[in-house]
Amino acid sequence: MKLTINKNSAKWMQLPRDVLVGHGVLEEIGDVCRDLKLKGNALIVTGNTTRDVAGKRVSTLLENAGSSTEMVLTCRATMEEVDKIMQKASETGATFLLGIGSGRSIDLAKLASTRLEIPFISVPTAASHDGIASSRASIIDNGKNASVQAQAPIAVVADTEIISAAPFRFLVAGCGDIISNYTAVLDWELASRLRNEYFGEYAAALSRMAARVVIENADSIKPEHETSARLVVKALVSNGVAMSIAGSSRPASGSEHMFSHALDRIAPKPALHGEQCGVGTIMMMYLHGGNWQEIRDALKKIGAPTNAEELGIEDRYIVEALLHAHSIRPDRYTILGNGLTPSAAEKVARITKVIS
């Protein structure tokens, strides 16, 4: 039998080399850099709050390990901020970057380091979404949220002592982002069947497993609890790995994410990304004919929003976001197809009790 190899089927997988998750692991960041042969000038990308939470300590630890450090403070995840970081890196001769924060600083360091062609380390101070280990960066470009391909971190250092001390709302949002894997994978399977899109079994299985772990442990996810933080961080890292294996965000981003991005554009005051994705997952699971009640019940146990009122968003914006969600990424086929009718959008939101 002759084996035919399709050269176009080859995929590049970029995964973190070191992942440290646990109590006090921030203190090991110097060892991580030595292990990865990272030396020279480090540029720390962080925010005002996270500078005090972890940024200053990381700077001290790196200098004790023999590196020199500079710090750049960020305020918004915009392309202008990326340019600012790149300029600072060039001025200081940075040989590697560290993103320290709950998401924004990590995404900025991720994209800036990709363009500079130097490695970066992800140091999350909260577990609010799966960007901590993925090769995607959420950036505001020309006033609109965009998901941009970038490099994965060379290492992730997630100190659960720090993460568990962050506002519990961030951890809850991270759970919503993970649980949304269920409908993301269903959308991916649908696109494979109807549009002959590539579907990766391994990436899909890893994505589903992360969501299942969070749902099965929903009762035990509590505030200021390091075990909870560890569980959620590991699931978020698994999401990042699944996306790297797939070569796209498909395993963790489908119609529920498109709904969330539509809300970002429409609602005057959007909620957290993971919170909106969780609510979106309830409705998209209904459209898929799945067990949407299980999704809703798990989110309730964790303390996540399950309706418009809990999101702090008016009912009409939920319906409007459902109507526009399919157009957020026209190239990505989902259960939304070519869009819902106004009556269908209102029906799914009412049946799932997302609106009253």
UniProtKB/Swiss-Prot annotation:
Enzymatic reactions: sn-glycerol 1-phosphate + NAD(+) = dihydroxyacetone phosphate + NADH + H(+); sn-glycerol 1-phosphate + NADP(+) = dihydroxyacetone phosphate + NADPH + H(+)
Gene that encodes the chain: egsA
Function noted in UniProt: Catalyzes the NAD(P)H-dependent reduction of dihydroxyacetonephosphate (DHAP or glycerone phosphate) to glycerol 1-phosphate (G1P). The G1P thus generated is used as the glycerophosphate backbone of phospholipids in the cellular membranes of Archaea.
Biological processes annotated in GO: glycerophospholipid metabolic process; phospholipid biosynthetic process
Presence of keyword S-adenosyl-L-methionine: no
UniProt source species: Methanosarcina acetivorans (strain ATCC 35395 / DSM 2834 / JCM 12185 / C2A)
Name this polypeptide is given: Glycerol-1-phosphate dehydrogenase [NAD(P)+]
Binding of substrate, residues: D130, D177, H261
Binding positions (NAD(+)): G103, R104, S105, I106, D107, T125, A126, A127, S128, S134
Entry's cofactor comment: Binds 1 zinc ion per subunit.
InterPro entries, per database record: G1P_dehydrogenase_arc, G1PDH, Glycerol_DH
This protein's record includes keyword Cytoplasm: yes
Pathway: Membrane lipid metabolism; glycerophospholipid metabolism
